[in-house]
Amino acid sequence: MPKRTDLKSILIIGAGPIVIGQACEFDYSGAQACKALREEGYKVILVNSNPATIMTDPEMADVTYIEPIMWQTVEKIIAKERPDAILPTMGGQTALNCALDLARNGVLAKYNVELIGATEDAIDKAEDRGRFKEAMEKIGLSCPKSFVCHTMNEALAAQEQVGFPTLIRPSFTMGGSGGGIAYNKDEFLAICERGFDASPTHELLIEQSVLGWKEYEMEVVRDKNDNCIIICSIENFDPMGVHTGDSITVAPAQTLTDKEYQIMRNASLAVLREIGVDTGGSNVQFAVNPANGEMIVIEMNPRVSRSSALASKATGFPIAKVAAKLAVGFTLDELRNDITGGKTPASFEPSIDYVVTKIPRFAFEKFPAADDRLTTQMKSVGEVMAMGRTIQESFQKALRGLETGLCGFNPRSEDKAEIRRELANPGPERMLFVADAFRAGFTLEEIHEICAIDPWFLAQIEDLMKEEKAVSDGILSDLDFAALRRLKRKGFSDKRLAQLLNVSEKEVREHRYALKLHPVYKRVDTCAAEFATETAYLYSTYEEECESRPSDRKKVMILGGGPNRIGQGIEFDYCCVHAALALRESGFETIMVNCNPETVSTDFDTSDRLYFEPLTLEDVLEIVRTENPWGVIVHYGGQTPLKLANALVENGVNIIGTSADSIDAAEDRERFQKVLNDLGLRQPPNRIAHNEEEALVKAEEIGYPLVVRPSYVLGGRAMQVVHSAEELQKYMREAVQVSEDSPVLLDFFLNNAIEVDVDCVSDGKDVVIGGIMQHVEQAGIHSGDSGCSLPPYSLSEEIQDEIRRQTKAMAYALGVVGLMNVQFAVQDGVVFVLEVNPRASRTVPFVSKATGVPLAKVGARCMAGISLKEQGVEKEVVPDFYAVKEAVFPFIKFPGVDTILGPEMRSTGEVMGVGASFGEAYYKAQLGAGERLNPTGKIFLSVREEDKERVIKTAKNFQVLGYGICATRGTAQYLTEHGLIVQTINKVPEGRPHIGDALKNGEIALVVNTVSSDPQSVSDSHIIRQSALQQRVPQYTTTAGGEAMSEGAKSRDHLGVYSVQELHGRLKNRN
């Protein structure tokens, strides 16, 4: 039956900011859904608070709202736009929960809006643990023994029934938030308390543990005529007990017999029928007992998920696009498969003739206090995917795509006790310890006994270790064509072979080239080569026939950013996608190289050709050899491609845009200093030190406090503010490895300076400022973690003009062609240059959304030789409204990690708020970031000596709004002396009742807590920040943040909603 004609406009709810458990896979699904529905003639209205997404680009939907995703805001949008239906299955758990809130609060009934894609009942049945269990029993499928609980007493009674270890799963959360595995009563009580808080319905499932069972997932699509297809079966390398988002996964499933596969296939179709998903995609998770084959259902997601993004990329079947069309009434047989050029219908089940491996990427180095053991609560921040013709090839390609310094199964330890520990308690590198165990002489049976990973997977790694041993016993010239080809087919990189042979990677590469041994490229075609495909979606392997068939058009190759991590996230993918779109429009053939399955850049129709490959020198050079591009762009994927720039130039690759030499001039301290001196610009006093003694001497020359860091970093890794020689000594000994080649940088720290970010674009002749952003948090907080406002909310016009002048001077001096970002600090009216990055920065998407100028597209065209004049981009656009970007943090996933912000970046994502005043925009950004300010209660202030004066204004603002003020002794005394009425409250060490009690009792509406840097005061006040985090009370660890919130709260009762299209239209008419 064709599409529904009774629906004219559809509202899509996005997933909001990137958090652990919900990353950019929902930008990919949302963008696909927008395209699919507009193709069919529907008016699409979109709401999403995350500006760094492709889906919030003004051309993706008819009307786009970058607004907080909460039912109250969405109700305003519904009242304004009057959609006929809402599609809630494209925005992860955020969108589902928002849709349920709209239904429960009567909004859908009031405006007569229908939920499509999943009914309220189907969402509830799948997400409510108790109802789901009943539904499974009804169709004869077993679930683990479990009980639904709403109180601690019920939970304790349930625990006695299921025994230890016990699994705790909260309802209506994602990424296993709040859940965990308890091995004793203390752990059980702690996890339950956390879980009740995390579940919006205050409900937990207490479940029997099936640790060590094998875990599988099925990606299923079903239409309203009950046509069902399995897109892909996925098998977890890690057994049950590790969240599937933190597990290494393989597709298709490798260790099922055909009979077992058919049983699981039938079960997953039965689950969809019973839950009532009849218009879209779902994923169903199973566990199988390896001892006797018993199969149980773990859970299902009635929506597009992280796994469906993986399944889409693994097979080439666009699940989100198909699901969106099914939601408006199409059936699978009516839709065509794009990859085969329409030769097959969408009801044709994909089959694949290769193996896909996904490995998660973690960021524990950012959270030294966090527990890095993997459990049922998700902790990874990104993932990498690789394809090969064998499991060994795809596994080794995925390892080197992770960008954690691996080039294969690099050794981690020779200590048998440590290896045993790592196998038994899964951590982020367990697969490497499996390899170490084989090297150390463990047998396959022993390893399986300790870690419960399937013997078939273990045998694959064992075989690779035998190969490694044989290679390291020989010399390079022993490897003839046949021997080297055999190793390459098993996925060994040149670099890993070089390590084993004790030679350089270049020598291995030259030896391989001399033997004329190169990979071929195979196409992803959804049908295992049954039909020919025009779609150039390619992966490398060492076989006979190459299917790449390159054209002879003028081509530009764009290197992507690889797996998401803290410091390099979706913002860089956004820039890569824009480069591909712009250059395609300008008549170039575009080639994308990337290995992140969550992103829009790895969608097969974003660029003309997609190579799904690791971003290593070896892999990139082979693609260049095959495609022979006119130019390569390395400036848009963050640090990943920049690291390859010099080596690519050495190998004769034409890098377009800003030259590798200019990038080096900006990143190399001594060269950059010379550029600034020549221009007469100021930097904070700084020095370079190559060892500890030198650092201590030079520190005295500049004076404390200092910012110290290693050279060449992104996301402020291992950066610290130190206040004394003792702290500096500790840093030099514990945090960094210093040498002649990698010195440590010392900068004088500008206290209480205002930090400013500027993005600009240049074609080599003209420079246009994209936007000037004033940071909310003072200098010293990493720019990626700081809120910022465009236009600036308190900088004078003179200072802004001086910043413009300096930015342009540096762009000319460095010969920038494309984008450039500068960070300034302004102290007492003096402008200092902190750093310059002649590349795309993480603020580019935000600036583009705020000003309506697509900077990344403009920059890419400049690189390809199209001038700013020709593009009609000649002057800076300054909005007549305020846009505020705010960072979003993962602290709730890492109990015990302190929330104090500093120079090391720790945010995973961002949101944007738009308003007529700075206050309104800031308040909306806080709502978007998940902060909820209670209308009643007290404001708690506890600040260090130098912040007391600044906090007076904050206290007065909140008092006017009717809040009571309470503070710790010193702060209270100071505020009382300045005419405020303040209640004094005990710090935790001072006896009860103390601030911790007040937070637990719900008396506190907001916390402003700043501390001096000495470890004692940090640890004394740690409990305040932890309690605030657990009680979900908004907290600010800078006075600037607290003050901005006090301004913002004034406008909370009259917040407007503005579409991007109306805002940009206003700016166009004004200019």
From Swiss-Prot:
Enzyme Commission code(s) on record: 6.3.4.16, 6.3.5.5
Taxonomic superkingdom: Bacteria
Positions with a binding annotation for Mn(2+) 3: 823, 835
Residues reported in the UniProt entry to bind Mg(2+) 1: 285, 299
GO cellular component, as recorded: cytoplasm
Binding site for Mg(2+) 2: 299, 301
Cofactor mode of binding and number, as noted: Binds 4 Mg(2+) or Mn(2+) ions per subunit.
Pathway: Amino-acid biosynthesis; L-arginine biosynthesis; carbamoyl phosphate from bicarbonate: step 1/1; Pyrimidine metabolism; UMP biosynthesis via de novo pathway; (S)-dihydroorotate from bicarbonate: step 1/3
InterPro entries: ATP-grasp, CarbamoylP_synth_lsu, CarbamoylP_synth_lsu_oligo, CarbamoylP_synth_lsu_oligo_sf, CbamoylP_synth_lsu-like_ATP-bd, CbamoylP_synth_lsu_CPSase_dom, MerR-type_HTH_dom, MGS-like_dom
Pfam families: CPSase_L_D2, CPSase_L_D3, MGS
Binding site for Mn(2+) 4: 835, 837
Span list, region Carboxyphosphate synthetic domain: 1-403
Carbamoyl phosphate synthetic domain: annotated segments: 549-930
Residues noted as binding Mg(2+) 4 in the record, renumbered to the chain: 835, 837
Residues at which Mg(2+) 3 binds: 823, 835
GO MF assignments: ATP binding; carbamoyl-phosphate synthase (ammonia) activity; carbamoyl-phosphate synthase (glutamine-hydrolyzing) activity; DNA binding; metal ion binding
Coiled-coil annotated spans: none
Binding residues for Mn(2+) 1: 285, 299
Record region (Oligomerization domain): 404-548
Binding site for ATP 1: 129, 169, 175-176, 208, 210, 215, 241-243, 285, 299
Catalytic activities: hydrogencarbonate + L-glutamine + 2 ATP + H2O = carbamoyl phosphate + L-glutamate + 2 ADP + phosphate + 2 H(+)
Domain note: The large subunit is composed of 2 ATP-grasp domains that are involved in binding the 2 ATP molecules needed for carbamoyl phosphate synthesis. The N-terminal ATP-grasp domain (referred to as the carboxyphosphate synthetic component) catalyzes the ATP-dependent phosphorylation of hydrogencarbonate to carboxyphosphate and the subsequent nucleophilic attack by ammonia to form a carbamate intermediate.
Subunit structure: Composed of two chains; the small (or glutamine) chain promotes the hydrolysis of glutamine to ammonia, which is used by the large (or ammonia) chain to synthesize carbamoyl phosphate. Tetramer of heterodimers (alpha,beta)4.
Function: Large subunit of the glutamine-dependent carbamoyl phosphate synthetase (CPSase). CPSase catalyzes the formation of carbamoyl phosphate from the ammonia moiety of glutamine, carbonate, and phosphate donated by ATP, constituting the first step of 2 biosynthetic pathways, one leading to arginine and/or urea and the other to pyrimidine nucleotides.
Protein's name according to its UniProt entry: Carbamoyl phosphate synthase large chain
Organism: Neisseria meningitidis serogroup B (strain ATCC BAA-335 / MC58)
Gene name of this polypeptide: carB
